[in-house]
Amino acid sequence: MRVAAATAAAGAGPAMAVWTRATKAGLVELLLRERWVRVVAELSGESLSLTGDAAAAELEPALGPAAAAFNGLPNGGGAGDSLPGSPSRGLGPPSPPAPPRGPAGEAGASPPVRRVRVVKQEAGGLGISIKGGRENRMPILISKIFPGLAADQSRALRLGDAILSVNGTDLRQATHDQAVQALKRAGKEVLLEVKFIREVTPYIKKPSLVSDLPWEGAAPQSPSFSGSEDSGSPKHQNSTKDRKIIPLKMCFAARNLSMPDLENRLIELHSPDSRNTLILRCKDTATAHSWFVAIHTNIMALLPQVLAELNAMLGATSTAGGSKEVKHIAWLAEQAKLDGGRQQWRPVLMAVTEKDLLLYDCMPWTRDAWASPCHSYPLVATRLVHSGSGCRSPSLGSDLTFATRTGSRQGIEMHLFRVETHRDLSSWTRILVQGCHAAAELIKEVSLGCMLNGQEVRLTIHYENGFTISRENGGSSSILYRYPFERLKMSADDGIRNLYLDFGGPEGELTMDLHSCPKPIVFVLHTFLSAKVTRMGLLV
């Protein structure tokens, strides 16, 4: 792995670390349409390019015995056999539809022999490509149907059809060349006798990175094909590579998130819009770790650019004094509780501004999207309650997690998050702690009405001056109690509506009815105290 120059943008803020960008290239496997296919992966500073490898076929399991046994059988064989090697779970498009059932409708019935009449066009011939032949111990199979040509217009042929005869000439024992010549000499009107073979369809329909790998914003580079009946000849191959370029900006690289990885060989790359997931498999654990670190490093190196774009977008359209600078934004995983008590990690995008902690399910590239987070929590009422290792492994060690608690009118809201690296954990820990303290200094004070000893009063907590309890008298107010923070001996709440404060004064413990859940003000008080202690150098 080669490392490029440092790339962190100047002025990105103290929360942003200096990152270097990695370059890397090598062979990996890609889960594409429920199959593992070999691709050449090339990592640059801003993108990951995947190129279909010509040797990918070597990774594919050999066709099952059903296809070979077809030769010589009057009606074809093995329709009910299955192919080995298919993964139990895939993220690509579904497999081709099942062939028509037999007359009785049984799922295992052998597909019928069909007779199809095709009229050749002046240019393009039948418009099919074929594979197989006696020398390959395979039937003659339709491997490609070219859009708009004769076979396609007939609407009666499909990929995976075995050609049994052409104008009455039996092709069950034909070699590939014999089949090609029979199709070429067939004249303008061609009567084909065909039968669908389900087992070979996944292998005939070779996955294409361009068409089968959905990814918003990816740049495709697609091969073009000739319209000949003989797809096996080198003269019909086009040198253009089947290639997909994945922009890394605001992608989420993860391990052991959406797919089990018992061998620690998988890497997951989630798109910024959360709609697509790319799964890569490496040859061993060490290689997977190396690739993951490189991809993750480059994604993180792009964050200063993302922050600059976000702040420019928000600042350009906000009203005077209403802008909230985005301090940090990145993907991580949040623990979600499912029915039956089960738990699951799911991707979540967390952003920290001057005053708020925001959670999104996709990257908010527009101001409207930014204004609609899934959750929004004031930093001054939020605290970090855990940061460290868990019990399971996202890559080579235990889970790295941190938890937040926020005081709200509904009580305490808790979130457990998982990060992928120790550097991420340290970064988020620092950002949240410093962000909460900075929010306390920025907000300065909170004030709310409440009941004390049966009368309406106002409780004000000021970051510098401490506590003030006052009573409104017409247009003026009178101060009942004023205490600095160091006079607070005890604070508590009942979790419902009452806040208890004891300053050691002659009035004793004050019971304040807040008319709603006291947790928000309790958490603000904790943040003020924590920020002041840290500022005094008593807590690092």
Curated annotation (Swiss-Prot):
Annotated PDZ domain residues: 115-198
Biased composition (Pro residues): 93-102
Domain of life: Eukaryota
Tissue: Ubiquitous. Isoform 1 is the predominant isoform. Weak level of isoform 2 is present in all tested tissues, except in liver and heart where it is highly expressed.
Residue span, PH domain: 163-300, 325-437
Disulphide-bonded residues: none
GO molecular function: actin binding; calmodulin binding; RNA binding; structural molecule activity
Pfam families xrefs: PDZ (PF00595), PH (PF00169), PH_17 (PF18012), Syntrophin_4th (PF23012)
Matching InterPro entries: PDZ, PDZ_sf, PH-like_dom_sf, PH_domain, PHsplit_syntrophin, Syntrophin, Syntrophin_4th
Cellular localisation: Membrane; Cytoplasmic vesicle, Secretory vesicle membrane; Cell junction; Cytoplasm, Cytoskeleton
Residues covered by the SU domain: 484-540
Low complexity bias (residue ranges): 81-92, 103-112, 222-231
Sites of Phosphoserine modification: S95, S110, S129, S211, S222, S233, S393, S395
Membrane topology: Peripheral membrane protein
Keyword field contains Membrane: yes
Region (Calmodulin-binding): 518-540
Keyword Methyltransferase in annotation: no
Region span, Disordered: 73-114, 220-240
Keywords: Actin-binding, Calcium, Calmodulin-binding, Cell junction, Cytoplasm, Cytoplasmic vesicle, Cytoskeleton, Membrane, Microtubule, Phosphoprotein, Repeat
One annotated Gene Ontology cellular component of this protein: centriolar satellite
Main location: membrane
Domain notes: The PH 1 domain mediates the oligomerization in a calcium dependent manner. The PDZ domain binds to the last three or four amino acids of ion channels and receptor proteins. The association with dystrophin or related proteins probably leaves the PDZ domain available to recruit proteins to the membrane.
Family: Belongs to the syntrophin family.
Role according to the record: Adapter protein that binds to and probably organizes the subcellular localization of a variety of membrane proteins. May link various receptors to the actin cytoskeleton and the dystrophin glycoprotein complex. May play a role in the regulation of secretory granules via its interaction with PTPRN.
Quaternary structure and interacting proteins, as annotated: Monomer and homodimer. Interacts with the other members of the syntrophin family: SNTA1 and SNTB1; and with the sodium channel proteins SCN4A and SCN5A. Interacts with SAST, MAST205, microtubules and microtubule-associated proteins. Interacts with the dystrophin protein DMD and related proteins DTNA and UTRN, and with the neuroregulin receptor ERBB4. Interacts with PTPRN when phosphorylated, protecting PTPRN from protein cleavage by CAPN1. Dephosphorylation upon insulin stimulation disrupts the interaction with PTPRN and results in the cleavage of PTPRN. Interacts with DTNB.
Designated name of the protein: Beta-2-syntrophin
Origin species: Homo sapiens (Human)
